Amino acid sequence: MQPPVQFLPRNRPAFGGYDAPFTDFLYFHLMGEPLCHPQLERFLELAGEAGFRVILTTNGTLLSRMQEVLLAAPALHKVNISLQAFEGSGMAMDFDTYLAGCFGFGQAAAGKKIVCYRLWNRGGLDSCNPAILRGLEGHFPQPWVQERRGI
């Protein structure tokens, strides 16, 4: 026997009412760009009110536009920026402008939020990797923590 299907009311976020003993974090990512959501700022507020910390994964294209909202959100704990997304998705944006926005966000977030730059394209589209790595070194001199196991 299967439990009955239930739907949440339209005005209630899916994480409302969950209890902290089950998890401390909410992850905003997967199957879409969370920075595109028109209610992102409100979701961050609600997450904080419920006692959650948010980890957000983005392709980075909207970081410049959303920087103020993200940095002002107490619930936002960490931002993962998938730098490989630029080459893999054919974004209609200048590459240098894209990198400047991603790296500028990281510099503005220093000491306030955790920022993780991801470059997960080994064996795929990776011709931009040398330029990305040079840009990272220019903005964030080494040593870095490099994690190659996908953790």
Write out the residue ranges for each language-model feature:
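Structured beta-strand/loop patches that form or line metal/cofactor-binding pockets in enzymes
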Residues: I151
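Conserved glycine-rich "GG(E/T)P / GGGxP" loop and the immediately following alpha-helix
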Residues: M1-R148
